[in-house]
């Protein structure tokens, strides 16, 4: 039975039992900022289990894409070396939200395994929590499992309710016992039943876990029965596929065999049992689906985990002999294997391949050098030795080797890595980076007062009272003239930095003094900190102030923020729906927008985006902002940022034909933007491009400056601006013709100089020796002259030098019959050392440079004596 058929049969079975089939959620959890990746089927239902969310159904079934790599659940180092460890896997699960409980959950599991999949019942073992008599009785009395195949598992992890068969979401909250189902591979495989001393063997393999959430644990550890007990189950598709296909390793199932064959094809490997092929086959799934779900290789967070997985795959390909990008070419094979179940993979195939290829090409530039350093160091160590942590950090910092990749290679050689030294080197680098960065006061301030009420959508000036003052991070009662600090107000028109938009600046004016606001940041979610300096007088807690935003800066920022929405929509229309925002910065000067895009934008695409945005501006439609519930916002079709966590209420912004969620400040009508111009487009990471654009008076000033430059260039070329291109092409043709004439003249000059120099050559033991300075000649001319002199002098050793821009250039040439005694590299370095330089090359030709032109005459004069010493 193929993996795809098992997946579908599971969904169909539970659908027939009244379950709603719920699609797999993203690998990037949208409702849990503490979780790096979705690692279980229940993640998308977590808020339902905790009562923070409701669904229109009480029974659900899903096949959830999961990743375990990085953080608490990290299987990376075992992948490829064991039968069942993966970075990516699919979790089949059925869920009850206060509907059915143990009785039906157990019966459903048994019916699916024995009736649908037709597994022999005598091959199945079960475990229950030692105190869960209810589950035990259901298994034995209702299902009919013999007592000999039901194992009670107690608290085996050193604490009350700390057991393999007791599940908890955390130290507090929903929890409960679980029952696990095991498959017996038979006596030919080593290992004992669950709960026995030999349970870690491979004979008895867990295939399904049913968690019964029936308690809520409080901070005192007391268990309170939940009013609506729930069920959360999980069965790995790869494990049950191995059972159904009568193989012992997950890597032997149909899905993996296709990917292993593809990896072997791309690395030209004939041994299909090689562990490196298993690594590559596993990693292509994790990497491809992470990119599909919006993760881009980077240097932190999820992006760095993705980069580590990609580079681990590349390293295993390198180990198999690959010396160029190969990994991305396996993506189409993955599409064939899994595209029917996950059509989003096929839809994004080109983008996935492009991002992987770029990441591969980048790492292949450094992997050979890095591997050379690593392998050289390993040769010095014996098994059981320790690899230098400082060197591991150098491999990480200079050659892009993640620590776990270095550790992986060392592990194969029986060597450990000094991770403490690595961590210390990393900490030093981070400390230096922090020291070089700009420090901003903000979230660290200790404030426990009332919240700030924001009025900045409607007004730019507002009376307010000072609630708190801070100086050097500590609360104070007063700020005096010249003091820098932070002011907290009860009301404010100042927008605090959020959503990529910078904080407002302006003034706080009281009877006692004036405070210049340089920036506005959130100290807490609803508490605004006004950062700045007292310009005159003083400011005290309790003072009444007039808070006034800098109107010009705010207007420019609003134009730039509003146009970002229009640009985002235009980018998706011109480049494709794969465009997703990866970051933004909006201030009074520009908007900077980072987005998913595998290749640079063409000039035509940039012009098209500009045209679409400016067309929206010309229509001059009104902007509308509405506050509504998150579900209502979703129904409107408003665009939401991928992976962003939103509250129950959100602000939906309609501007032009764009509709997005946004809490920033915006223009009243699109026409207020005035003018839009993209000023730069560049790459910031593999698969991520950056556009910078300007609006309004800034855009006008930019275009006027470019126009002035064109007029000045036209005047210099004595041409009309409209004819500048043709005139420039004509001028360049003329320059190229002159350059060719110059090259011919230089060659003649070099030949003439060569003829004169032949007569200056000294004869030492039958070898012509020449050392001379040539002026007005470049490096190319120097070499041509040396070649001609060598031909004319026959048996010779010569050095020529020239000076340009305060730098010395040298060349040494030696005929083949002389290289046994005189090497050109040695000869040129004798001279170079005297002029403050060094060089190198072949035995018959070498070049060098120097920094001391004044020493050149004496250095050249020393050549004859040195040659004499080598020939005598």
Swiss-Prot record:
Its EC number(s): 6.1.1.7
Keywords, ordered alphabetically: Aminoacyl-tRNA synthetase, ATP-binding, Cytoplasm, Ligase, Metal-binding, Nucleotide-binding, Protein biosynthesis, RNA-binding, tRNA-binding, Zinc
Aminoacyl-tRNA synthetase is among the record's keywords: yes
Cofactor note: Binds 1 zinc ion per subunit.
One GO MF term: zinc ion binding
Broad class of where this protein is predominantly found: cytoplasm
A biological process from GO: alanyl-tRNA aminoacylation
SMART domains per UniProt: tRNA_SAD
Subcellular location: Cytoplasm
Entry similarity comment: Belongs to the class-II aminoacyl-tRNA synthetase family.
PANTHER family named in the record: ALANINE--TRNA LIGASE, CYTOPLASMIC, ALANYL-TRNA SYNTHETASE
Domain characteristics, as noted in the entry: Consists of three domains; the N-terminal catalytic domain, the editing domain and the C-terminal C-Ala domain. The editing domain removes incorrectly charged amino acids, while the C-Ala domain, along with tRNA(Ala), serves as a bridge to cooperatively bring together the editing and aminoacylation centers thus stimulating deacylation of misacylated tRNAs.
Protein name per its UniProtKB record: Alanine--tRNA ligase
Gene: alaS
């Amino acid at each position: 039975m193929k993996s795809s058929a098992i997946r579908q049969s599971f969904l169909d079975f539970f659908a027939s039992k009244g379950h709603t089939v719920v699609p797999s959620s993203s690998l990037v959890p949208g409702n849990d900022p503490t979780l790096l990746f979705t690692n279980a089927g229940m993640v998308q239902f977590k808020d339902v289990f905790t009562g923070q969310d409701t669904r229109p159904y009480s029974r659900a079934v899903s096949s959830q894409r999961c990743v375990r790599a990085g953080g608490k659940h990290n299987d990376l180092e075992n992948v490829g070396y064991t039968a069942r460890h993966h970075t990516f896997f699919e979790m089949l699960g059925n869920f009850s939200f206060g509907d059915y409980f143990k009785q039906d959950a157990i019966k459903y599991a048994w019916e699916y395994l024995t009736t649908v999949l037709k597994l022999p019942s005598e091959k199945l073992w079960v475990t229950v929590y030692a105190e869960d008599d209810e589950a035990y009785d259901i298994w034995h009395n209702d299902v009919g499992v013999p007592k000999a195949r039901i194992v009670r598992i107690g608290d085996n992890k050193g604490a009350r309710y700390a057991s393999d068969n007791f599940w908890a979401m955390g130290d507090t909250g929903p929890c409960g016992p679980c029952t696990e189902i095991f498959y017996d591979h038979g006596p030919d495989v080593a290992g004992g039943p669950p709960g026995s001393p030999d349970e870690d063997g491979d004979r008895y393999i867990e295939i399904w876990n049913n968690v019964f959430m029936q308690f809520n644990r409080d901070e005192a550890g007391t268990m309170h029965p939940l009013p609506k007990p729930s069920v959360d189950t999980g069965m790995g598709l790869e494990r049950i596929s191995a059972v159904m296909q009568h193989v012992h390793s997950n890597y032997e199932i149909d899905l993996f065999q296709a990917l292993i064959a593809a990896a072997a094809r791309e690395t030209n490997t004939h041994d299909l049992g090689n562990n490196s092929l298993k690594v590559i086959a596993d990693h292509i799934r994790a990497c491809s689906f992470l990119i599909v779900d919006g993760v881009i290789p980077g240097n932190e967070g999820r992006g760095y985990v993705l980069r580590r997985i990609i580079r681990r795959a590349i390293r295993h390909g390198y180990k198999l002999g690959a010396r160029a990008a190969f990994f991305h070419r396996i993506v189409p094979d993955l599409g064939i294997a899994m595209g029917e179940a996950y059509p989003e993979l096929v839809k994004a195939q080109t983008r996935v391949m492009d991002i992987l290829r770029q990441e591969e090409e980048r790492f292949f530039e450094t992997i050979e050098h890095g591997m050379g350093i690593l392998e050289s160091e390993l040769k010095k160590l014996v098994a059981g030795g320790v690899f230098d942590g400082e060197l591991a950090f150098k491999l990480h910092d200079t050659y892009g080797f993640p620590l776990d990749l270095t550790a992986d290679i060392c592990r194969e050689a029986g060597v450990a890595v000094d991770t403490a030294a690595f961590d210390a080197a990393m900490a030093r680098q981070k400390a230096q980076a922090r020291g070089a960065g700009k420090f901003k006061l903000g979230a660290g301030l200790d404030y426990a007062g009332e919240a700030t009420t924001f009025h900045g959508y409607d007004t730019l000036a507002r009376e307010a009272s000072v609630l708190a003052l801070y100086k050097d991070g500590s609360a104070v009662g007063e700020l005096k003239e010249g003091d820098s600090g932070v002011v907290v107000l009860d009301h404010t028109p100042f927008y605090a930095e959020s959503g990529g938009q910078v904080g407002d600046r302006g003034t706080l004016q009281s009877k006692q003094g004036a405070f210049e606001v340089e920036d506005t940041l959130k100290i807490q979610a609803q508490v605004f900190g006004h950062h700045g300096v007292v310009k005159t007088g003083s400011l005290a807690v309790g003072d009444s102030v007039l808070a006034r935003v800098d109107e010009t800066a705010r207007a420019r920022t609003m134009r730039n923020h509003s146009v970002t929405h229009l640009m985002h929509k235009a980018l998706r229309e011109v480049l494709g729906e794969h465009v997703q925002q990866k970051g933004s910065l909006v201030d009074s000067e520009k908007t900077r927008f980072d987005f998913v895009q595998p290749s640079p934008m063409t000039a035509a695409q940039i012009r098209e985006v500009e045209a679409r945005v400016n067309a929206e501006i010309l229509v001059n439609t009104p902007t509308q902002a509405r506050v509504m519930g998150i579900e209502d916002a979703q129904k409107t079709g408003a665009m939401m940022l991928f992976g962003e966590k939103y509250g129950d209420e959100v602000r939906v912004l309609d501007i032009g034909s764009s509709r997005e969620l946004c809490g920033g400040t915006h223009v009243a009508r699109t026409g207020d933007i005035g003018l839009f111009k993209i000023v730069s487009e560049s790459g910031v990471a593999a698969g991520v491009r950056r556009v910078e654009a300007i609006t309004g008076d800034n855009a006008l000033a930019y275009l006027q400056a470019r126009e002035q430059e064109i007029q000045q260039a036209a005047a210099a070329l004595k041409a009309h601006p409209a004819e500048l291109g043709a005139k420039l092409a004509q001028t360049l043709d003329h320059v190229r013709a002159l350059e060719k004439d110059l090259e011919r003249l230089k060659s003649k000059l070099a030949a003439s100089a060569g003829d004169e120099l032949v007569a200056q050559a000294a004869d030492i033991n039958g070898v012509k020796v020449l050392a001379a300075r040539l002026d007005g000649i470049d490096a190319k001319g120097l070499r041509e002259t040396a070649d001609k002199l060598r031909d004319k002098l026959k048996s010779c050793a010569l050095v020529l030098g020239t000076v340009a821009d305060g730098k010395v250039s040298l060349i040494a040439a030696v005929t083949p019959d002389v290289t046994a005694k005189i090497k050109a590299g040695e000869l040129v370095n004798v001279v170079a050392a005297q002029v403050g330089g060094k060089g190198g090359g072949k035995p018959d030709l070498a070049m060098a440079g120097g920094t001391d032109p004044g020493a050149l005459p004496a250095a050249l004069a020393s050549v004859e004596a040195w040659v004499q010493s080598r020939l005598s």
